[in-house]
Amino acid sequence: MAEITAAMVKELRERTGLGMMECKKALTAAGGDIEKAIDDMRAAGAIKAAKKAGNIAAEGSIAVKIAADNKAAVIIEVNSQTDFLALQDDFKGFVAESLEKAFNEKLTDAAPLVEAREEARLALVAKTGENVNIRRLTRVEGDVVGAYLHGHRIGVVVNLKGGNPELAKDIAMHVAASNPQFLNASEVSEEAIAKEKEIFLALNADKIAGKPENIVENMVKGRISKFLAEASLVEQPFVKNPEVKVGDLAKQAGAEIVSFVRYEVGEGIEKAEVDFAAEVAAQVAATKQ
């Protein structure tokens, strides 16, 4: 068998856009023949998939799997370029298999899952013509773990000390609807408070102008108190019964909220702005590849 040199791997990588390990694997299978390796990779759809990798994937699905004893759960986000693909069976199957693997192997980070599912991902990209990425994963373990999935776009996992699965699911539903930023006020950083103060002062510059310093200080304190209540889960009015705060709801059931994880599809991903004509042209061009 021909020796696979670094120069050969480099050349194949430059010509195909694929990773070094994939190029080395392809060269080994092709007996060191670069042209054959390229043909094999093209036949497998790998090169097409690599070209799609630069496309922004900001749609997709959130998926959650919870243990039968409610002691553990895994939540993952898998992105696609369009919501249309997120609703198709091929994509759903990829997500389900990825979630199952993450849960069964007790993975706590997305990196090993991304590596393990790369071949299946490339096959899906080649078949659908869209970029697909496993973006993130969180595993939660605790006394009582509950989850709520709102369609395929928002997923929440809540960890309780005490209580029951129904309570955990109710609180998870609340988190999905109200999107708290923190568990309680003690988790709010000084940076977040300073930013909120800065925003308040900027938005109310006209109202504040000419007022005594102590009055302005009280106005700021009032806004910060409101911010902490709005942003903290335990201080929010429970969506099913606004007369009760979420923290009090948990206490009444003999429970304490330990943590929560909320995923929403595409949050934090900067979407490229493409006009309609350009999008249609791009789709037409894609059909000719």
Swiss-Prot record:
It is found in: Cytoplasm. Keywords: Cytoplasm, Elongation factor, Protein biosynthesis. GO terms for molecular function: translation elongation factor activity. The keyword Protein biosynthesis applies. SUPFAM superfamilies: Elongation factor Ts (EF-Ts), dimerisation domain (SSF54713), UBA-like (SSF46934). The keyword Protein biosynthesis applies. InterPro entries: EF-Ts_dimer_sf (IPR036402), Transl_elong_EFTs/EF1B (IPR001816), Transl_elong_EFTs/EF1B_dimer (IPR014039), Transl_elong_Ts_CS (IPR018101), UBA-like_sf (IPR009060). Residues 82-85 are annotated as: Involved in Mg(2+) ion dislocation from EF-Tu. GO terms for cellular component: cytoplasm. Associates with the EF-Tu.GDP complex and induces the exchange of GDP to GTP. It remains bound to the aminoacyl-tRNA.EF-Tu.GTP complex up to the GTP hydrolysis stage on the ribosome. PANTHER family: ELONGATION FACTOR TS (PTHR11741), ELONGATION FACTOR TS, MITOCHONDRIAL (PTHR11741:SF0). HAMAP family: EF_Ts (MF_00050). Belongs to the EF-Ts family. This is Elongation factor Ts. It comes from Pseudomonas aeruginosa (strain LESB58). The lineage of its organism: Bacteria, Pseudomonadati, Pseudomonadota, Gammaproteobacteria, Pseudomonadales.
